[in-house]
């Protein structure tokens, strides 16, 4: 069974790019264009991993991350953002993100980050 990944990004172009990359890596993909929809889709679709944009209309990505982790402490989340400041990375690490993907997306980096996060999630489930 292919791992399901939820892409959360208010940019249709970013969602399409990530979908194309993930589908070449043999992942099943579901999408949400904002934070509130992401929370709904997460609990309806039960994805194995969430790729989450930080800067979105309505609900900031960090707030979505915190809410996801409150509702499901085992939620696996990788942040996708153009903001590469170390303070931003520390904030998302502290909130429980398992990785960080820079925009614009590079296929190999996306697939490596997804694979690493899924492996880390599998390791934490067995401990």
Question: Each predicted region: which residue ranges?
Answer:
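Alpha4 helix (beta4-alpha4-beta5 surface) of REC/receiver domains from two-component response regulators
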Residues: 63, 84-101, 112
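Acidic catalytic/metal-coordinating carboxylates
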Residues: 34-37, 60-63
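Receiver (REC) domain switch/active-site region of two-component response regulators
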Residues: 106
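Conserved phosphotransfer cores of two-component systems
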Residues: 43-45, 67-74, 95
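Two-component/phosphorelay signaling modules centered on CheY-like receiver
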Residues: 12-30, 95, 117
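Active-site beta3 strand of CheY-like receiver
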Residues: 45-51
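The feature encodes the CheY-like receiver
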Residues: 57-58, 85
């Amino acid at each position: 069974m292919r791992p399901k990944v939820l892409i959360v990004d208010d940019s249709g172009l970013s969602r399409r790019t990530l979908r194309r990359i993930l589908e070449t890596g043999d992942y099943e993909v579901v999408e949400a264009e904002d934070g509130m929809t992401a929370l709904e889709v997460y609990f309806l679709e039960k994805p194995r991993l969430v790729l989450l944009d930080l800067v979105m209309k309505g609900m900031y990505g960090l707030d979505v991350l915190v809410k996801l982790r409150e509702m499901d402490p085992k939620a696996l989340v990788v942040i996708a953002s153009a903001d590469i400041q170390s303070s931003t990375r520390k904030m998302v690490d502290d909130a429980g993100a398992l990785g960080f993907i820079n925009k614009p997306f590079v296929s190999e980096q996306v697939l490596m980050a997804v694979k690493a996060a899924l492996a880390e999630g599998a390791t934490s489930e067995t401990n």
